[in-house]
């Protein structure tokens, strides 16, 4: 019986959790009563509950003590008490991984799963599968097959769910149960049908054709379970995304037909699936949006919430498709559920006209303080999207955001506001001073180090270019006086940027930096000393290199290189060119703003750092030097062919490594000694091939081809390679995968592979392009004019140039202002070998686009390559 606590105990909270002060040693001591005769079910139940509570609270049980408690617990199978037996099953599952010799209960569990007590059979199956390994699975295979098709739904579901878990241990054994799973899928029980469909999908998910057949079968025969329908919709949408089929396919028709299902769950799943399909047109979205519009007026809050949240996502990409729902959304603004009201307003912000912005902002202001931080973030993201859509409304937005910034709130909420203000400042030059003023006010009382350093970085970047830069110095130096070490260090860097760009402020900045040299923190002192010495030289080139633009190398790569340098002392100075470059950040489309992640940010190695490590581990590539650039994968086969091959081009100083990722999609073949032979155009030289030892069915493998680049860089800039995959084939049994002993040689022709000028250039960001331009100098400057007769707009010309050259646009010059007939594009990069490369392109629109290209580098070769490739 449950103990009744005194009312006073309840109020004080002392009796709310009877297990709060449990000690592991005392509980294990109590577990000795499991060995007593006769068994006392009530006491044993209480002790098992305590053990499970400790395990779920994260209490560590040693192997010995866990095994002793487990063995004692096995005696409880002698009792016929139903509740005690089911508690034993739970304990077995929890202790399976921490106890030794858990298989001793196999016979007891097997007896229960095949017995007449239905209440035992399901839990016994789940417990047995938890302790079974791959070697024991075949012993219970017959029982599992029987259980899957059992007439008792709880037993069948238990066996099916256990089968899903057993796939991780022994996929091949579970694969033999496919006929039983097919039979269970026709069950009248909704949960059995749902679980059976899950098992069938996971058995076939690596075979697209089998999944398509399964989908076709169930869409024709129909299902009784709404849960199974939801899973089938998810399988169908995944198939559409993978196959990139047109939306005219029967699979899309099935998803659309589910919009007319009698279950609301299925209707919503179908609408959500259609909305999340890539490349969906407004016409294809219309039925899904209509269904969600009906849900907006549902009496059920959960349905209204689901509808408005999904419409909110649609509005990011297809605002015009949601416009029809505006009246329903306006009715939801006054919804008693604040989450629904918030989403309704933020959706309206994305779909409404410019004239409705002021009214909506007033409505948000009336209740924004009442909603949770999570939804405040959604509001801020909607405002950010709105700023991009209606730039002239930035002053209204800025006022609203600054008021929100003063309110109480957590880190994620404040970060979203700060990011939004920074975005407005960068996109709208006329809002710069107002935005910086609000941020300066915020850092005066900011408790978040990350945000303070981010704002100081922005002040250092944008502040020196404002009409009155001196007004920001006080706010920055206050951080040096009042804040922690990280913020003080960021403030020192910001001060240095003001001194580097404003000659009249330099004497004051030097005085402030001298004061910073007395700081208690060595990072702050080091920065102050470094910047002071650079600024005292009064050289623009030094300022550009060490203050404005900073390092462009990979930080994890630099850490490894420096560590290696310290292990092998050398008289030669450390060479910065031995470090891989950092890849330029890829800015997301602003329309696709996602919820702010709550996970802590880590300095994870980049894709290029991972490739560098993988290639360095291959003996043939050890002496190629640092990896300069890795391209995006290029597909060399059609989607539905026998073999799937794609290539990643790894560029080094004098070599290129082609990495071929190969997959064999034939289940009756094993491929061995797989290589890709490349036939280059003249001047390139193939040095060696590193084969993939074997390619079993559906398991990816990698082979490499090493090519020496021509010495004449103007020839090396572009080339075409014909590719042929060569291998030894061994036929094998599709069911067992066992190959024959004899093999034969074969080959497969792949599509041609192109090397372009962009493969030789790595993007780097230059925050201050003018300073970088002066730093490089005009020693190797060249200028030419070209006519782009086929290009009709400046935007098209800018995008084509950026894509072709593979360089990083600077100073936001990739954005062409409206109604302009001329534009300047600034591009920065590093050419293979470590040479800085800058391009200034002046574009004029007349009959087509005329382009004047000026290229600078510290070497002549990169300049010639760029002009030759453009011409």
Curated annotation (Swiss-Prot):
Localization: Cytoplasm, Cytosol; Golgi apparatus membrane; Cytoplasmic vesicle, COPI-coated vesicle membrane
Keywords: Cytoplasm, Cytoplasmic vesicle, ER-Golgi transport, Golgi apparatus, Membrane, Phosphoprotein, Protein transport, Repeat, Transport
Entry keyword annotation includes Oxidoreductase: no
Membrane topology: Peripheral membrane protein
Region (Disordered): 1-20
Recorded GO CC terms: COPI vesicle coat; cytosol; endoplasmic reticulum; endoplasmic reticulum-Golgi intermediate compartment; Golgi membrane; growth cone
BP terms from Gene Ontology: endoplasmic reticulum to Golgi vesicle-mediated transport; intra-Golgi vesicle-mediated transport; intracellular protein transport; organelle transport along microtubule; protein secretion
Record flagged with keyword Iron: no
Record-linked Gene3D superfamilies: Coatomer, gamma subunit, appendage domain, Leucine-rich Repeat Variant, TATA-Binding Protein
One function term, GO molecular function aspect: structural molecule activity
Phosphothreonine modified-residue sites: 594
Start-end of Basic and acidic residues biased regions: 1-11
Chain positions of HEAT repeats: 64-101, 283-320, 321-355, 356-392, 395-430, 467-504
Any matching Pfam family: COP-gamma_platf
UniProt subunit comment: Oligomeric complex. Binds to CDC42. Interacts with JAGN1. Interacts with TMED10 (via cytoplasmic domain).
Similarity section: Belongs to the COPG family.
Physiological role: The coatomer is a cytosolic protein complex that binds to dilysine motifs and reversibly associates with Golgi non-clathrin-coated vesicles, which further mediate biosynthetic protein transport from the ER, via the Golgi up to the trans Golgi network. Coatomer complex is required for budding from Golgi membranes, and is essential for the retrograde Golgi-to-ER transport of dilysine-tagged proteins.
PANTHER family xref list: COATOMER SUBUNIT GAMMA, COATOMER SUBUNIT GAMMA-2
Name of this chain's protein: Coatomer subunit gamma-2
Gene: COPG2
